[in-house]
Amino acid sequence: AEFFGGGLTIRATVDPDLQAAAAAALREGLEKFDRAGGVWRGTGKVIAADRLGEGAGWRAALAEVAVPRDIAGWHPAVVLATTGKAARIGIEGVEDDPDGHFIPAEDVSWARKRLADGKLGAKAKGAGDLVEVGDVVLVRAITNDDGSFKRWSLRQVPEVQGAFMAMDVNSGRVLAMQGGFSYQDSVFNRTTQATRQPGSSFKPFVYAAALDSGFSPATIIIDAPIEVNTPQGMWRPKNASNKFYGPAPMRTGIEQSRNLMTVRIAQEIGMDTVAIYAERFGVYDPMNPFLANALGAQETTLFKMVAAYSMFANGGERVEPTLVDRVQDRYGKTIYRHDQRVCEDCQLASLGAGFAPRIVSRRERVMDAITAYQLTSMLQGVVQRGTGRGIHLPVPFAGKTGTTNDSKDVWFIGYTSNIAAGCYIGHDQPRPMPHASGAGMCGPVFQAFMQAAVAKYGGGKFRVPPGGHFINVDRFTGSPLVDGSSGDNVVAEYFRDGEEPTFGMLVDGGFGMGSNLPLFAYGEVGSDEGDATVITGTGETKVIPGKANFGTLSSGGLY
């Protein structure tokens, strides 16, 4: 009774601008994939010919048809006639034009209609090849660069679905949540309800457990074939490239999403340890300690994954996502507030120039602050030169791609210093998505949303916790370099004070590495551009052998 009749004021966390940005970004990504498939399905709804009369006739009939009306810029319409290669349409909410509204031939050349025998017909040469009189369709206006009207365009709700979520990494406030292409088309919230394999986007939790178990980003891991005898038969995980690259630093393993390195790390530290971390971060409850789950085989939700990544971003403190910021009673008294952090200086009348209020947190620490920074640095490498290198933002950010077997599910989850966001795309009934990858499909969705988020909320450098120091390391070999070294292969790794790194130690997970294997030097992505050089702090030039070439994105996943 108090809830419904007590005059309570409930403040939601969702930012309307960012919610609109999330919906637009996800819809654009889903529609791009759907249209690339080139199959016209339409709405499947038809209005009888006797209800297509001029004036209010077709409008009344169209208003009764159940089609999505919550997609920004889209309008329900009905085909009134097909003339030549164009189709004349009546559009809900748009006044009649004396010359008529038309779908021109140029708008349908991307599509083919599925024939009665299940085969695809030829590419449409005119609108009449796709639609018939009485068909209910969805349309949107295409504009010129100056915003002027160009033409009406046929649209359809994609078969592929997805979800997107963004949250404040410090307060837990959910800033945006999009559970699918259209709520009116499907009320299923894929952010919270769809349990899917996260694939390689789970790997950071394996690496986090390793970093807390004595590993460093420069620890050398063997990338070579593995065979595991299981009750279901022999399991032979593979890299996405179907190649293996020999000894490489742990940083390379996550930047290039190496499955074999990840499995060896998980075997070395123990899957029980990995499970403890996954459960501590709320990804699973419980996690089954099987090696395949180190590659993201066990299902979870996007909601849980974004919440877990938020704890990487905030330095390792527990944060719970919420859609309710606070609740006030009828007198304006706050009776519930989600964010329990304390502002030490908010009662002061003023602060000195350059000072900000101190926010004190007493939250549980789920991860060592130095481990969180090391992992963030490695995930920055993913977007700088790894599987997510096609994503660009004007502020520092980190993230991880995920692509499962046969590209049935694709992910990208990333974060700036203040906002974490994640994208998932896949069919509700899992099936392969040809040529799909987390970077290629979810990457652009993440980028489009985060550009809007950064424009509104900004972003800065990730905070370096006290208690450590930087050492320049050759990211190809894991070898230490002198201070002042420069070059494409130089990376500054952060190590704990008093725990000097051990360089040159090989980790194989107990699997070993066979002899006479066709290994690729340093396992880098890209063309063989010849030798690379490094200028050391003493002015010496060190030659690094050319990179191996193994083609396009290595998104990792379940192989």
Model region roles, listed by residue range:
Residues 14-15, 280-346, 354, 360, ...:
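Active-site-proximal helix/loop microenvironment
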Residues 48-57, 81-85, 92-95, 133, ...:
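Soluble, non-transmembrane domains of envelope/secretory-pathway proteins that act on or interact
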Residues 166-181, 211-215, 226, 246, ...:
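Glycine-rich, acidic and aromatic/proline-enriched surface loops and short helix-turn segments
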Residues 3-196, 200-202, 208, 215-219, ...:
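Periplasmic/cell-envelope proteins involved in peptidoglycan metabolism and beta-lactam response
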